[in-house]
């Protein structure tokens, strides 16, 4: 009953809450109920915050700019209107952000690793996503997903998570769209030449999935979302795999790549 009340409150608040720094999927369709088993919902007493990705039963990846006080994480949700019996709620036990992250730049090293207060149980609607074994290839078709708004011009939250296919873009294309990006950057850009398919308000922290692996974390983009010449920018997870694995193994003093 407690979980049901928490979920009900979350979903009611989610309808009216707009997070300025979050991103959301536009131009997509309802995700298949079994394709987002790793997708995590972040919320607090004010409402919906961000998305995240389960990478094993005890650890979750999200964006560093999604950090907030007193948030919880919800696993196994598909519909606001229909409860899954295997939905689970967890609190963060430990949060890890790159110690060498620029504090005055929320786009820098935009990754956070969270240890849960207790492991989640894998189930029909809950399962982790693999870390990348190699960097993403330009042109690869990848999947974005999230609970964010489905309209680039007004806040319109769906009852179910939406998914869309987009492509990994060459970093030169990204730098042409965003000249402030460094030539060597631990980010990856993804989008389509046509306007419409993109992350938008509400999707920050969620995954960019390529070949069944998490290659990116939704970080930032131009506004309004869905502009073909302004692709979404994602934290490049492959560049942080050593940092992630070191922390999980107990070496919490490790720093992130420059």
UniProtKB/Swiss-Prot annotation:
Q: Which residues form a coiled coil?
A: none
InterPro entries from the UniProt entry: Peptidase_S1_PA, Peptidase_S1_PA_chymotrypsin, Peptidase_S1A, Trypsin_dom, TRYPSIN_HIS, TRYPSIN_SER
Recorded GO MF terms:
serine-type endopeptidase activity
The secretion signal range is 1-18
EC number(s)? 3.4.21.-
Tell me which residues this entry annotates as catalytic: 65, 110, 204
**What superkingdom heads the lineage?**
Eukaryota
Kindly state which keywords UniProt assigns to this record, in alphabetical order.
Answer: Disulfide bond, Glycoprotein, Hydrolase, Plasminogen activation, Protease, Secreted, Serine protease, Signal, Zymogen
Q: Where is this protein localized, as stated in its record?
A: Secreted
GO CC terms in record: extracellular region; secretory granule
What positions belong to the pro-peptide in this record? 19-24
The tissues in which it is expressed are: Expressed by the venom gland.
Q: What are the Peptidase S1 domain coordinates in residue numbering?
A: 25-249
Q: List the disulfide bonds.
A: 31-163, 50-66, 98-256, 142-210, 174-189, 200-225
Chief location of this protein within or outside the cell:
secreted
| Single Gene Ontology BP annotation | modulation of process of another organism
The UniProt entry, under Gene3D superfamilies, shows: Trypsin-like serine proteases
Residues with attached carbohydrate: 44
Describe its function.
Snake venom serine protease that activates plasminogen. Shows a preferential cleavage at Arg-|-Xaa instead of Lys-|-Xaa bonds.
Subunit (UniProt)? Monomer.
Entry's family note? Belongs to the peptidase S1 family. Snake venom subfamily.
Instruction: Quote the protein name from its UniProt record.
Output: Venom plasminogen activator
The record lists the organism as Agkistrodon piscivorus leucostoma (Western cottonmouth)
* Organismal lineage: Eukaryota, Metazoa, Chordata, Craniata, Vertebrata
